[in-house]
Amino acid sequence: MTKLRGIFAATMSILNSDLSLNVDKTIDHAEMLIDQGCHGTAIFGSTGQSQLIPISEKIDLLNKLSKSKYKDKHLIGTGLNSLGETINFMKVASSLNFKKFLIMPPAYYKYGDSEVIEFYTRIINSIPKCKIILYNFEKLCGYKFSVE
């Protein structure tokens, strides 16, 4: 896998009036960012309301995004607190040949270094060919990564 370089813009999740994910408009927005010069996008980060989008709608988007001409230019955020759901979602994404992920430690509970390391270790052991960007957003997850 090549090293990620460049600007990866956070994408918005476009919602329908019933608050369901508008898959087509969300993908159009992401592709527009690339057309405008970004090297890639981060889908389902905090700007993309990842914590609020149902897994089934995320999977619907991934199925359609897997056919995009820019497929290899997207980081896929998980936005899930459950380790098992994170791994299962990543396995679905991996089956569609998405390999780059943006993963924040679980939110709400206070975690120490050993618990966060264990969280990422289990993900890597379950999906060894994935490339992970550590999502360092202390305000949202309550954990601050150290340089060690």
Task: Tell me what each language-model feature is.
Residues 2-144:
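Active-site beta->alpha loop and helix N-cap motifs at the rims of alpha/beta catalytic domains
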Residues 146-148:
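Short, intrinsically disordered, charge-balanced linker/junction segments flanking boundaries
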